[in-house]
Amino acid sequence: MDNLFTFLHEIEDRYARTIFNFHLISCDEIGDIYGLMKERISSEDMFDNVVYNKDIHPAIKKLVYCDIQLTKHIINQNTYPVFNDSSQVKCCHYFDINSDNSNISSRTVEIFEREKSSLVSYIKTTNKKRKVNYGEIKKTVHGGTNANYFSGKKSDEYLSTTVRSNINQPWIKTISKRMRVDIINHSIVTRGKSSILQTIEIIFTNRTCVKIFKDSTMHIILSKDNDEKGCIHMIDKLFYVYYNLFLLFEDIIQNEYFKEVANVVNHVLTATALDEKLFLIKKMAEHDVYGVSNFKIGMFNLTFIKSLDHTVFPSLLDEDSKIKFFKGKKLNIVALRSLEDCINYVTKSENMIEMMKERSTILNSIDIETESVDRLKDLLLK
């Protein structure tokens, strides 16, 4: 980890990170983080009863548990704005909301109606304007006019699915769904699967998302703000997430080790100089501290922050290159999966930029109208 941050610091005058995803590999000695969090979230409907430690409340927006039988959101109401009457309601036509109408539940309903949550994304995805049922086309081919085509309503206690079809092309379906949602206090509950993955998610107020899988491996999607400047700010954001995450784990699984790690993490946060932060991170790696010793890069992107004032020559890019140009002038390096990958493509990017500058200078010095076609091909296509 310290080597990655050291290199990102070396190039931060030219490149800035955009997407940054990483994993914390599960450790048997830590315990069943997933199982204990699942138990706590499943049994409670008040945020304070899930997250006891009030010091970390401002950092956590909500927790989500999703498996085949249940999806449950526990929200921290204090992290949401007060809505006015003109605030846009996003999802009324997708959900039937049941609530006990208490003040707490009514506030949760208000938030749910206006937030673009994963439930809204899921129900929008499963509502399909047009879907071809190839099995029914096969019936038409082999069964003639007597083939049966389904249209109508299928429903259970929590999900109603309406299938409509055109009489002339009955194998083309329009599918619409409505989901029942129960809201009690800070909890938003629906039954059945509402996600591709079975995970626990912790959504931070800074938009970072932590996904915890069944084996307690974690996937962390680190958010990016416009005011993030250089590697030192990135380290502070990551370790701020660590600090609050580890205190949450200590709170829920009652393992004092996480409190100790949170204290070590806090030393990184309070250090003011980058060299000091990197030194502390290296020491954490040497002592096999959770969060550093089990850190593994998932994927990250870099963007070239300087302006490209010269002509861009796309022919210099390999077909499978991770160097991409967007809108003609924006250079990004995408899908980097290791420090070695990063060093390799930054080097290629630097060399390519120099070659483009040279070609651009030559191109600007010649008369395009009188120059030979072969010469122009050499400049533009090779």
UniProtKB/Swiss-Prot annotation:
<keyword id="KW-0804">Transcription</keyword>
<dbReference type="InterPro" id="IPR008789">
    <property type="entry name" value="Poxvirus_intermed-TF"/>
</dbReference>
<keyword id="KW-0010">Activator</keyword>
<keyword id="KW-0805">Transcription regulation</keyword>
<comment type="subunit">
    <text>Heterodimer of a 45 kDa and a 32 kDa subunit.</text>
</comment>
<protein>
    <recommendedName>
        <fullName>Intermediate transcription factor 3 large subunit</fullName>
    </recommendedName>
</protein>
<comment type="similarity">
    <text>Belongs to the poxviruses A23 family.</text>
</comment>
<comment type="function">
    <text>Acts with RNA polymerase to initiate transcription from intermediate gene promoters.</text>
</comment>
<dbReference type="Pfam" id="PF05718">
    <property type="entry name" value="Pox_int_trans"/>
</dbReference>
